[in-house]
A protein has these predicted regions:
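Hydrophobic, well-ordered beta-alpha structural blocks that scaffold small-molecule cofactor pockets
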Residues: 1-125
Length: 125
């Protein structure tokens, strides 16, 4: 591993570039426009996805478990506690939480709601 390798320096390997690709193909192939979009996570990736959806004019719900962020408005969307997901009718959720332990808890939460991976929720991590 070295600091000058292409995957460390080329713009196409930037974190946000991959997010843009994932979002593009999610919207093209997986998103059901009759279902509301939800973003789970309000870190760098969550904010990037939120910004892109706003730019595309796609409305969405935004959930997280960070008490400091819940209730705040970012890009014109108010962050809600993740428990509000169960009140959203038939959502498709983009998960942007990178922490593996939290990802397992998130999957367990989806399981409790009878939601299926790659149909009802998608990890963008």
């Amino acid at each position: 591993d070295y600091s000058t390798r292409t995957s460390r320096t080329h713009e196409h390997y930037a974190q946000n570039y991959f997010l843009d690709i994932k979002l593009h193909y999610f919207l093209k192939l997986d998103h059901n426009t009759s279902r509301p979009v939800t973003i789970w996570g309000a870190g760098f990736k969550g904010k990037t996805i939120a910004k892109r959806l706003v730019e595309k004019g796609i409305s969405f719900h935004w959930i997280c478990d960070n008490e400091k962020k819940i209730g705040k408005e970012i890009y014109g969307v108010k962050l809600q506690p993740f428990e509000d997901l169960k009140e959203i009718i038939n959502p498709q959720t983009i998960v942007t939480v990178a922490n593996e332990t939290e990802q397992k808890q998130i999957v367990a939460y989806f399981d409790n709601l009878n939601m299926k991976s790659m149909i009802d929720y998608f990890f963008f991590c």
